[in-house]
Amino acid sequence: MRRSAAAYQKFTEDEIRQANSVDILSLARGYGYEPEKAGRKAVHMKHSGGLYIFPENNRFFQWTGPDDGIKGGAIDFVMREENLSFPKAVGKLIGKEYAAEARQVTPYEKKERGPLVLPEKADNMKRAYWYLVSIRGISPQIVSHFMNRKMIYQEKKYGNCVFVGYDAEGTPRYCSMRAARENSSFKMDATGSDKSYPFFHEGTSDLLIVTEAPIDLMSHASITADFYGRDWMEDHRISTGCLWNGAIDRYLEGHPQIRRLVFAVDNDYLARDKDGQFRNWGQLTAAKWVREYTGRGFQCAVHVPHLNDFNTDLMERRKGRTVEDLDRLRMAELEAEFNRDAAEEPENEDEQEMET
């Protein structure tokens, strides 16, 4: 008797490979997406908030929007679209019942977000505090400020740093986690997080400073206080959690006194697109936001970090480096990248003919 998808508990490597071999572009059409060519290797899904599919290696990547950074193969795609567990997604992809469903083109519907599930709190916050102050270089007073407001705490199970965004009634609506370990890249949002509710500091001026991540927000504030002697609390500050402006718009709705915006997002000067071309996603987005919000009557400016982000700037400044030193570091990184490209570039066909 054939097992249903729900009956699968474990899968062989061949079964997982079979599930991941299902064509993602066909899956996307089945979910109601409309493909359009976006480059030599990428296919963009219209009205998707930045969903790109790469048929050559059967992968997808979400560049912007609330799901910014989500990527993977066919299994991950089905898990994302239908909010399924890994076993159910694999069973759906390799089961006969899936083949019948995949041929049906149904309108795409964004799945309703479930309730926010906050990680359990640890008994203390020593590890999170140590990581943010000693490893990330953030001012102790600033870390304590957010911890005292229950916007930062330490997760009980793994010791991760937890950052919480609240709505106007004080209800947690957004939660992101970051490993409190040096050299770890782990970070993720908690189940049910709504990125339109930012991690924030409510100031008193008419200026809002927009960063990408909570650590960026606190790093920018630390630079303001420790290196320029200004009151970091005077201005409003939010982190968007991605390169999507949902959090900006929601914060502006609740703070009509704000008339000036500073976009202090990442300086992705070494980032590349899927075709290998340099693409400074952070600054491209900042330029787009300047155009949009200037058109809406706001005074806008961009504060570009010298290195990749303001936390990198802060950590280097803590070592005694000047802003001129940071600029030299950036130029050295770019020069090394350009030299690497030049070394890998194939010889010109005309030059090859001359040598023969």
Label each PLM-derived region with a short phrase.
Residues 1-102:
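N-terminal structured subdomain of primase-like DNA metabolism proteins
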Residues 1-7, 108-194, 199-202:
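Basic, glycine-enriched DNA-binding surface that flanks or lies within the catalytic cores of DNA
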Residues 62-65, 78, 132, 163, ...:
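Terminal peptide-recognition signature
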Residues 55-56, 153-254:
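Phosphate-handling DNA/RNA-contact segment within nucleic-acid enzymes
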Residues 33, 84, 137-138, 208:
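Helix N-cap/coil-helix junction residues
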Residues 1-16, 61, 69-72, 206, ...:
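TOPRIM fold recognition
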Residues 31, 81-82, 136, 224, ...:
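A broad structural signal for alpha-helix termini and local helix breaks/kinks
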